[in-house]
């Protein structure tokens, strides 16, 4: 059934390709008519780092990716080695994190009508903090699992909100280059930080899992607050 569903999605995407071509053609004609079809400048990495707040937003994105990917890859191991669940149950419960992200992204779409990007990011950070604390303190297995869901829910609005806020913080003319580097920093965080926690877990213990997430959450919070101060965009 899963393969049939995936084949169906692929077919829909292929069929819809001509629609995208028509859209871009109309957009190009509209830009040419209005005289606004100029190519945006491509900034070098050095130029991006010189923009006030750019370095901080890159490291904030790096830290977010560290939180999300470490949670997704190490949650089941934490449930087995620290909370004592069987491998089968841990694998099932670890999916709660992804359920949290999925549900959270859907809910975020409606909340954005009321909150701006910075408020969405702060909301996500607050929810992650509650989830991390629920896993740190010995409130029992049920609360720890709830914390895992909350971490997923908190992660949901941050990724899209950081990207969406980039033009407001740095200007539309610079946003294309900055978003490209943001993606690079996100992938670096994704690739490096989960294995780094593996080294910590092997050397010290997997009990540091929620603390590890909390450290990156704090860094992300302070980095984004610095972005707000430097760009004067709340």
Task: Write out the residue ranges for each language-model feature.
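Paired small-residue
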Residues: 131, 142-150
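A late C-terminal transmembrane helix in Major Facilitator Superfamily
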Residues: 169-206
């Amino acid at each position: 059934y899963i393969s049939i569903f995936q084949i169906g999605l692929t077919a829909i995407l292929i069929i819809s390709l001509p629609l995208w071509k028509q859209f871009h053609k109309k957009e190009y004609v509209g830009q040419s008519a209005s005289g606004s079809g100029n190519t945006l400048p491509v900034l070098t990495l050095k130029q991006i780092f010189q923009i006030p707040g750019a370095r901080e937003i890159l490291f904030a994105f790096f830290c977010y990716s560290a939180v999300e990917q470490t949670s997704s890859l190490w949650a089941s191991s934490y449930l087995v080695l620290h909370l004592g669940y069987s491998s089968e149950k841990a694998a099932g419960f670890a999916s709660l994190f992804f359920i949290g992200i999925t549900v959270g992204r859907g809910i975020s779409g409606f909340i954005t009508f009321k909150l701006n990007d910075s408020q969405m990011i702060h909301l996500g950070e607050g929810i992650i903090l509650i989830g991390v604390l629920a896993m740190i303190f010995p409130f029992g297995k049920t609360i720890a699992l709830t914390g895992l869901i909350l971490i997923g829910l908190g992660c949901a609005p941050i990724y899209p909100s950081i990207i969406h806020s980039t033009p407001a913080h740095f200007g539309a003319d610079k946003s294309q280059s900055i978003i490209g580097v943001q993606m690079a920093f996100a992938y670096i965080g994704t690739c490096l930080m989960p294995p780094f926690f593996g080294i910590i877990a092997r050397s010290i213990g997997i009990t540091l899992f929620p603390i590890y997430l909390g450290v990156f959450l704090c860094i992300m919070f302070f980095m984004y607050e610095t972005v707000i101060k430097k760009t004067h965009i709340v």
